[in-house]
Amino acid sequence: MSDDETLADVRIVLIGDEGCGKTSLVMSLLEDEWVDAVPRRLDRVLIPADVTPENVTTSIVDLSIKEEDENWIVSEIRQANVICVVYSVTDESTVDGIQTKWLPLIRQSFGEYHETPVILVGNKSDGTANNTDKILPIMEANTEVETCVECSARTMKNVSEIFYYAQKAVIYPTRPLYDADTKQLTDRARKALIRVFKICDRDNDGYLSDTELNDFQKLCFGIPLTSTALEDVKRAVSDGCPDGVANDSLMLAGFLYLHLLFIERGRHETTWAVLRKFGYETSLKLSEDYLYPRITIPVGCSTELSPEGVQFVSALFEKYDEDKDGCLSPSELQNLFSVCPVPVITKDNILALETNQRGWLTYNGYMAYWNMTTLINLTQTFEQLAYLGFPVGRSGPGRAGNTLDSIRVTRERKKDLENHGTDRKVFQCLVVGAKDAGKTVFMQSLAGRGMADVAQIGRRHSPFVINRVRVKEESKYLLLREVDVLSPQDALGSGETSADVVAFLYDISNPDSFAFCATVYQKYFYRTKTPCVMIATKVEREEVDQRWEVPPEEFCRQFELPKPIKFSTGNIGQSSSPIFEQLAMMAVYPHLRRVFYLNDSNLLSKITFGAAIVALAGFLVLKNL
Ligand SMILES: Nc1nc2c(ncn2[C@@H]2O[C@H](COP(=O)(O)OP(=O)(O)OP(=O)(O)O)[C@@H](O)[C@H]2O)c(=O)[nH]1
Ligand SMILES: Nc1nc2c(ncn2[C@@H]2O[C@H](COP(=O)(O)OP(=O)(O)OP(=O)(O)O)[C@@H](O)[C@H]2O)c(=O)[nH]1
Ligand SMILES: [Ca+2]
Ligand SMILES: [Ca+2]
């Protein structure tokens, strides 16, 4: 393929029996008049986009069976987006050639069930002869045949139309949308259109009201529908599809039926215009660009939802919380994510989130979910927001909408430290502790689950728990992440050591518990800027001496760590426990590390930290548990 060739959006290949007029057809198109003597075959022709009705660069390949060997023909066919099989209406044997030679050769090139459209072109239709009777059954019997046209290179009849149809067959292909055997929409087209319907049904009542239909129309075609047009659409639907319209609104069945009508009437471009607006490419998959916008995240920066992102996901919650109880029941939750390819919040990972007594996701838990994935798995946030329709309606001129606007990249952590402040909202806290130290109980408390809940969860496990925590008057998200270090010898990955704060848990009733924390601390966090804190668990039990060089309090003093905090029984199951506030606080104000250590409110009042100090005073009081 030459460089020019690769530029072509549409590649049309002409094949057919000898002498049926392939070269003449291309000549007539190029010269805009009949040319008597044509060469055996023409070189590749490249037609620039601006002279084609659909504005696509088109290449036309004229093949002559005499000159080309079959391998060459097959290789040209394979590169084609659409194939015109030319026959002569004055020569029946060329009609037979379609079924005996050309269609089989195309299948042999692409495979039995290929999707490359074929157009049957009956040339030399300048006399009285036609072959419609023989052609229609061929079209019926071979679903890859998109359409058939009779034309004449001599009189110019339908010459430009053929090439226009060929282009349209590529840009607005039928086969992904329509199953000619069953005369129904294909499964993937149904699925795509169901997604479109759900996104457009903005109040989630199952109907497209006139307003919703009009917005949809404006979105896809740029102009509103007149009220007569609206009525016409609804009448056409209810005539052919009894359950298509109810309450004077379009139902899902009606919406699908409407698209079936478009397709059956040859107006595929209408359905394609809709699908493309919602991110689909020709394969009816969402395009890579739509799903995964390009973004670079500099080292030390993190990703969070932008105000638009927050607004979008929060509106989704409103839309799907049908009974307005502030929680998503399993069916509401399933409904919300039904346009996504895989269920995202499962029985297991819902344990990372706050739920109500019945185990239903709260608004808080739902928002926390988005904050979590945006921090730890941005690709997944992009993908889900794309499926959920975030980009829809956000496309600028010449640019398909994408999900980039849903995200903001935070300032580098180093700069935050230098400036003693951050506008980040989501912070990550590692939870480190020996086996049985009480990590799960501690973490689940942030989601509001207590001992009994944890006992029920059993071995099911989420390595994350996230919730909203108040720091000063602001709310921040604290993401707890359990590190799976079975022994202090295990290596921590860079993802793990890059946390904003580390909580080391040790069981006061187990003499070997603290050694684990001390070892991991010294190995990974000593001399780093990451704030760390020791947390004593199972404090209602009798305290035993820890088998370590020094007791925990002494250890903390040596390393200038804050005194160990007691995670008392009263804190279990409490998402608003002051311990979580303290962790969030340490994550938000890491430069106050030494202040946390000094733990002296008199001294504190003498140092000026700007706004941070106000909150800190409050926190230090809370700290003496
Ligand atoms: N009456 C009539 N004759 C045509 C028409 N188109 C082509 N012909 C004649 O048919 C003959 C074959 O035309 P070509 O364009 O060379 O056919 P081709 O399909 O390119 O032939 P090969 O390259 O040999 O396979 C020539 O004598 C043309 O003048 C047409 O529309 N009407
Ligand atoms: N009495 C008391 N028991 C606790 C406390 N915290 C945890 N436990 C119990 O200690 C045991 C271990 O707690 P988990 O939270 O599962 O500990 P873990 O660190 O997650 O354990 P692994 O994941 O197996 O390493 C469980 O039986 C808990 O019920 C506490 O504060 N007081
Ligand atoms: Ca030729
Ligand atoms: Ca509605």
Swiss-Prot record:
<keyword id="KW-0472">Membrane</keyword>
<dbReference type="GO" id="GO:0005525">
    <property type="term" value="F:GTP binding"/>
</dbReference>
<feature type="binding site">
    <location>
        <position position="201"/>
    </location>
    <ligand>
        <name>Ca(2+) 1</name>
    </ligand>
</feature>
<comment type="function">
    <text>Mitochondrial GTPase involved in mitochondrial trafficking. Probably involved in control of anterograde transport of mitochondria and their subcellular distribution. Plays a role in maintaining mitochondrial morphology.</text>
</comment>
<dbReference type="GO" id="GO:0097345">
    <property type="term" value="P:mitochondrial outer membrane permeabilization"/>
</dbReference>
<feature type="binding site">
    <location>
        <begin position="123"/>
        <end position="126"/>
    </location>
    <ligand>
        <name>GTP 1</name>
    </ligand>
</feature>
<keyword id="KW-0106">Calcium</keyword>
<feature type="topological domain" description="Cytoplasmic">
    <location>
        <begin position="1"/>
        <end position="601"/>
    </location>
</feature>
<dbReference type="InterPro" id="IPR021181">
    <property type="entry name" value="Miro"/>
</dbReference>
<dbReference type="Pfam" id="PF08356">
    <property type="entry name" value="EF_assoc_2"/>
</dbReference>
<feature type="binding site">
    <location>
        <position position="212"/>
    </location>
    <ligand>
        <name>Ca(2+) 1</name>
    </ligand>
</feature>
<dbReference type="InterPro" id="IPR011992">
    <property type="entry name" value="EF-hand-dom_pair"/>
</dbReference>
<feature type="binding site">
    <location>
        <begin position="470"/>
        <end position="474"/>
    </location>
    <ligand>
        <name>GTP 2</name>
    </ligand>
</feature>
<dbReference type="Pfam" id="PF08355">
    <property type="entry name" value="EF_assoc_1"/>
</dbReference>
<dbReference type="InterPro" id="IPR001806">
    <property type="entry name" value="Small_GTPase"/>
</dbReference>
<keyword id="KW-0496">Mitochondrion</keyword>
<feature type="binding site">
    <location>
        <begin position="433"/>
        <end position="440"/>
    </location>
    <ligand>
        <name>GTP 2</name>
    </ligand>
</feature>
<dbReference type="InterPro" id="IPR052266">
    <property type="entry name" value="Miro-EF-hand_domain"/>
</dbReference>
<keyword id="KW-1133">Transmembrane helix</keyword>
<comment type="similarity">
    <text>Belongs to the mitochondrial Rho GTPase family.</text>
</comment>
<dbReference type="GO" id="GO:0005741">
    <property type="term" value="C:mitochondrial outer membrane"/>
</dbReference>
<dbReference type="GO" id="GO:0019725">
    <property type="term" value="P:cellular homeostasis"/>
</dbReference>
<feature type="binding site">
    <location>
        <position position="332"/>
    </location>
    <ligand>
        <name>Ca(2+) 2</name>
    </ligand>
</feature>
<dbReference type="GO" id="GO:0005509">
    <property type="term" value="F:calcium ion binding"/>
</dbReference>
<keyword id="KW-1000">Mitochondrion outer membrane</keyword>
<keyword id="KW-0547">Nucleotide-binding</keyword>
<keyword id="KW-0812">Transmembrane</keyword>
<protein>
    <recommendedName>
        <fullName>Mitochondrial Rho GTPase 1</fullName>
        <ecNumber>3.6.5.-</ecNumber>
    </recommendedName>
</protein>
<dbReference type="InterPro" id="IPR020860">
    <property type="entry name" value="MIRO_dom"/>
</dbReference>
<dbReference type="InterPro" id="IPR013567">
    <property type="entry name" value="EF_hand_assoc_2"/>
</dbReference>
<dbReference type="InterPro" id="IPR027417">
    <property type="entry name" value="P-loop_NTPase"/>
</dbReference>
<feature type="topological domain" description="Mitochondrial intermembrane">
    <location>
        <begin position="623"/>
        <end position="625"/>
    </location>
</feature>
<dbReference type="GO" id="GO:0007005">
    <property type="term" value="P:mitochondrion organization"/>
</dbReference>
<dbReference type="InterPro" id="IPR013566">
    <property type="entry name" value="EF_hand_assoc_1"/>
</dbReference>
<feature type="domain" description="EF-hand 1">
    <location>
        <begin position="188"/>
        <end position="223"/>
    </location>
</feature>
<dbReference type="GO" id="GO:0003924">
    <property type="term" value="F:GTPase activity"/>
</dbReference>
<feature type="binding site">
    <location>
        <position position="203"/>
    </location>
    <ligand>
        <name>Ca(2+) 1</name>
    </ligand>
</feature>
<feature type="domain" description="Miro 2">
    <location>
        <begin position="420"/>
        <end position="625"/>
    </location>
</feature>
<keyword id="KW-0479">Metal-binding</keyword>
<feature type="binding site">
    <location>
        <position position="327"/>
    </location>
    <ligand>
        <name>Ca(2+) 2</name>
    </ligand>
</feature>
<feature type="binding site">
    <location>
        <position position="207"/>
    </location>
    <ligand>
        <name>Ca(2+) 1</name>
    </ligand>
</feature>
<dbReference type="Pfam" id="PF00071">
    <property type="entry name" value="Ras"/>
</dbReference>
